[in-house]
Every structure is written in structure tokens, then in C-alpha cells.
Design a protein with these regions (language model features):
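S-adenosyl-L-methionine-dependent methyltransferase catalytic module, highlighting the catalytic core
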Residues: 95-99, 106-195
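Class I SAM-dependent methyltransferase "Motif I" SAM/SAH-binding loop
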Residues: 24-26
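Class I SAM-dependent methyltransferase SAM/SAH-binding core
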Residues: 29-69
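A short SAM/SAH-binding and catalytic strip from SAM-dependent methyltransferases
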Residues: 80-92
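Conserved alpha-helix/loop element of class I SAM-dependent methyltransferases that forms part
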Residues: 1-17
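Short conserved loop adjoining the S-adenosyl-L-methionine
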Residues: 69-75
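Alpha-helix C-terminal capping/helix-to-coil transition sites in glycosyltransferase folds
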Residues: 16, 76-77, 103
Length: 195
């Protein structure tokens, strides 16, 4: 089975032989791909069913909450931290990003871009929160509590003195222009590092 587009990019970008913590690792799909290339991947996942599935796949995963349990990891415990499609579900995204870069010098952060043109059009035209391929549930059922945009995330990391090493913008599974990312990218993947 093919990896989700953001996970495929992250899997390709993580160097072999590194230590990785996948925060919000889901069923361990990315960890399996990383393990196949010689990465020592560990996972933190809030959903018990996903933890069980990941462990059944042979992955090292603990049940925990990114909002509270990242503090239990020592400084520089990993080479990379990964937070894929999870930032928008955290209580304090700013604190979670700080914790990622405390436990690893670099982090991959991917998220749906709530400023994508379809989202903007749905709000303008219908006056309602949209339901899209990347945001597939109604506003009252969504786990998303912080609707982040590419520009918002750039502002956050700039304010915290965090370096951007690389950015990928995707519309569907295809790259989109960085110049038009604010409104054309359905989701973004940032590789960030301590300042």
C-alpha cells in the first residue's frame, strides 16, 4: 500500500541510521517505511486501537498524548521528531513545536492548509466550514481545534527563532509552487530546526 503523500516525502527525506520519534504515529505506517530503510523509529500515539495495530506490525509505540507526554522524553533523545497531520489537533501547537525541537534538533511538521482556495471559497460561498478530502468531517466532529495556514505556521516559527530547512507544498499528491502556497497548497510539510 502506498504511503500518504506527506508521509512518502518524510520517509524519503529521513536519513538511514537515524533515531526518530513519530508523534501521533497512527497505525505505524510511516514507522514501517522508515524501518525498511534502517531508521530506528519509535512512536507516540493517543488512540489505543492505533497503538495495538502499530505494535502488531512490530513497531515500538507507546500510548500517550503529545500535549502532555513529550515532556517525559529527555533532551536530544532523537535525531528527528515527526508530527504529521497532528499539529492542528493539539491544545497548544506552539508548545508542542518547542517540545519537538527539545527532544530532537530537527522536526518534520505537516498539516492541512486551512487557507487553501477550496476552503476559502466554501467559507465565502456557503458561509460554512468546508468538508473536503483533507478535512473530511463536519466542524462539530473534527479533531482539529487550531486551523493553521502556511502563513500562520511561518509566523509561529519565525517568532520562536526556528529555522526552516526545507518546505514541501502539496495539492493532492502533486507539488505546488512555493509562491502560491498560501492559497494553492492543500497541505504543507516543513523540516524545521533549532535556531
Amino acid at each position: 500500500m502506498a504511503l500518504r503523500p506527506d508521509l512518502a516525502i518524510i520517509a524519503a527525506a529521513v536519513p538511514a541510521g537515524t533515531r526518530v520519534l513519530d508523534v501521533g504515529c497512527g497505525d505505524g505506517e510511516l514507522m514501517v517505511a522508515l524501518g525498511d530503510k534502517g531508521v530506528d523509529a519509535r512512536g507516540l500515539e493517543i488512540d489505543a486501537a492505533n497503538v495495538t495495530t502499530a505494535i502488531a506490525r512490530g513497531q515500538s509505540v507507546v500510548q500517550g498524548d503529545a500535549n502532555r507526554d513529550l515532556a517525559d522524553y529527555p533532551d536530544d533523545a532523537f535525531d528527528y521528531a515527526i508530527l504529521s497531520q497532528t499539529l492542528q489537533t493539539t491544545e497548544r501547537p506552539d508548545r508542542v513545536v518547542d517540545e519537538l525541537l527539545r527532544i530532537a534538533p530537527r522536526a518534520f511538521v505537516s498539516f492541512p492548509n486551512f487557507a487553501h482556495w477550496r476552503v476559502r471559497l466554501a467559507l465565502l460561498w456557503n458561509g460554512r466550514m468546508p468538508v473536503t478530502r483533507l478535512l473530511p468531517v463536519a466542524w462539530y466532529e473534527t479533531p482539529n481545534i487550531h486551523h493553521v495556514t502556511v502563513s500562520d505556521f511561518r509566523d509561529l516559527i519565525h517568532a520562536r527563532g526556528i529555522r526552516v530547512e526545507r518546505v514541501w507544498h502539496l495539492s493532492g499528491d502533486k507539488p505546488t509552487s512555493d509562491a502560491a502556497a498560501s492559497w494553492r497548497a492543500e497541505h504543507a510539510i516543513f523540516l524545521i530546526a533549532r535556531g
